[in-house]
Amino acid sequence: MFEKILVPVDGSETSWKAMEEAKKLAEAFRGEMVVVNVIQPYNNAALLVVPLDQATISQGNEELTKIGNSVLETAKEKMQDFKGKKEFLLEVGHPSERIIAVSKEKACTSIVIGSRGPAGTAEFFLGSVSSKVSQYASVPVLIVK
């Protein structure tokens, strides 16, 4: 079950806790880890309340990509002591959908995910990501508080 663990990280404290738990499991079972950050791009459909021009949307998406890469760099630093095989991915799309898709694409045997994302207005939304992943994933899901 822990031969290849997918760990979504978003920079929140719970995602780092999930990564640490996944690391322990991977070490104990001599497994691999796939660490993923999913950015959800801006588009006009998502911004119906305040329509923005394409240049502003593109600039926002570039910033999201920078943030996603920064989260993955932090993950790489935190994973330096892990001796097993590890992979780091930046994905674009709806978080729960991409997490489930990556788990299939990479033939992961389990998912270890934090229970909530960053605090603030996104907290409810990101908490629903772990809920959707646990409901629709085809592999076992461990939710870390």
Locations of regions flagged by a protein language model:
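Small/aliphatic-rich secondary-structure junction motif
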Residues: 3-55, 78
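General small-molecule cofactor/ligand-binding pocket signal
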Residues: 36, 87-91, 142
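Short, hinge-like loop/turn segments at secondary-structure boundaries
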Residues: 50-54, 105-107, 129-130
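A short acidic, glycine-rich active-site loop
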Residues: 54-69
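Structural beta-alpha unit
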Residues: 77-111
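Glycine-rich, Arg-bearing micro-motifs that act as flexible, cationic patches
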Residues: 110-135
